[in-house]
Every structure is written in C-alpha cells, then in structure tokens.
C-alpha cells in the first residue's frame, strides 16, 4: 500500500533529526570537556589502531528504545543479578538504581566508601560506588566500579524495566574517579 506523506509530516521528521543531532553534539561536547578535565589533554582523532575480535567476546540481544538508545541485559555480582540497562557510549560509568542492585547479596561486591553524583542529558543520580563482577554476553570483568544510585533515577523510561545506565566509553571520560582498570572496558583488557 502506498502512502503519501505531507509537508507537515516531513517537518516533523526534520524536527526529530534536528533534535537528535543537537543531542549527539551536546553529548560529544560534554565528553570532550570531561576528557580534558580528567587528562589535561584534548582528544585526538582515532589513532588508526586496527581492531580485531577478541577471544573474550560474546553476543548480546539488544533492543532499540528509540533512534539512539540501545537496551540489553547484563549481570552484576556473584551470583549474577540481572539488570536491564541502557548502553551509554558517552561515559564509562555504570549506574544502577538501589532497588535493583543489591551489593549485600553478592559475594564479590566491595564498598569503596566513596560517593558519586552524575548528571546525564536527562536523569541525574547520586549514591555510593562499589566494585563487583560484571558480565555482559558471557564476558566477565572483575572489580568493575558500579554507582549504586540512592534513588531509581531511570523511573521515567518506558515500561519501568530499565534500571540503569551502562557506560561503554573510554575510561578517561569517567567521573567516578576510579582507575581505568575499574571500568568495564578497562577491566575486560585484563
């Protein structure tokens, strides 16, 4: 069946594209500023490193929430506590709501006795930083920093199933003040 789109629908699509472009620009501008604050250096262009599939890789079923948001399930702790998270390419921080992540139920959690406060382009969260085992698609990383939010900061997301943000960005963009090896990306290299 053919459908004819009118000028109003085209404007709506353009508004969405414009809004999405502004979101991406703001995200990367914030990342560049955080990188500079953490390292004292300006970001450079990708250094041309050849990427190859690592032995510690797996596959994960992802669901697209909207045009720029991917959602999937990870496990935190021992035994693993399943968490549905939004993957965040703009930060290495992992932040989970307190009603979902229970460090006292994990044999491998450690309270760093350190607080955090982060603001994303939407939700903000504050709480305590722990380290624990994190497993994504069968790839296990130890001693990963997890911000356990003192509130359910993701409560505005659809269906109420998303309990946190899972950072996949460069460790130098982090705001937890932990060593690179305590981010998920850093820990998988060990």
Task: Label each residue range with its predicted role.
Residues 1-190:
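Non-catalytic N-lobe/flap surface of aspartyl protease domains
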